[in-house]
């Protein structure tokens, strides 16, 4: 598996440090607000699991599963495969994503959830690729700003593989072809 990786972009130790930091920051910002963390599956699963262990306030968790159609003729359409179980009216939502790329997915989700009248919607992302942004959406909490490269590991996949790598790596170009 690791032979497919060109280089390590972010080590496991570095991830641990930054995730702990935003966990503390969110705990300060949402003290007494009982937020709901909304994980966007599948990419969020390792990040969210680690992040939650650094959140020290009362909160709950829920998950959504989405898929986006991205081909060459991208319509920006996002399909909801699993919706929330909890009622979010009047609640503070924190969307947890693996990576903010074009922003199409999170922009869609924000609008989709807004009509349920939550008290607020914030975004926590492990990585942000600002160079590729198409939609007007910004992360409130971001661990790493990265260049425009396709990365895998720590929950992120290429064709469903490499999610189990403990670090963030850049794939070798020949893997794509
Ligand atoms: P967006 O709608 O373009 O912001 O896409 C966000 C989703 O695309 C993420 O949740 C990932 O699932 C996927 N994605 C974007 N960039 C990468 C990457 O470099 N590696 C793996 N998945 C990515
Ligand atoms: Mg994802």
Language-model-detected regions and their locations in the chain:
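PRPP-associated nucleotide enzymes
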Residues: 1-177
């Amino acid at each position: 598996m690791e032979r497919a990786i060109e280089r390590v972009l972010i080590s496991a130790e570095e991830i641990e440090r930054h995730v702990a930091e935003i966990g503390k920051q969110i705990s300060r910002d949402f003290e007494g607000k009982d937020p709901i963390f909304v994980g966007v599956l599948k990419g969020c699963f390792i990040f969210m699991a680690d992040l939650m262990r650094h959140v020290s306030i009362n909160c709950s968790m829920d998950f959504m599963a989405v898929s986006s159609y991205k081909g060459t003729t991208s319509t920006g359409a996002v399909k909801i495969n699993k919706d929330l179980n909890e009622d979010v009216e009047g609640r503070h939502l924190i969307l947890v994503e693996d990576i903010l790329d074009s922003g199409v997915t999170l922009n869609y989700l924000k609008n989709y959830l807004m009509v349920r009248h939550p008290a607020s919607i914030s975004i926590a992302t492990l990585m942000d690729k600002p160079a590729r942004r198409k939609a007007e959406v910004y992360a409130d909490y971001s661990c790493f700003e990265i260049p425009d490269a396709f990365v895998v590991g720590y929950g992120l996949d290429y064709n469903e593989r490499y999610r189990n790598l403990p670090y963030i790596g850049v794939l070798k170009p020949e893997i794509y072809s």
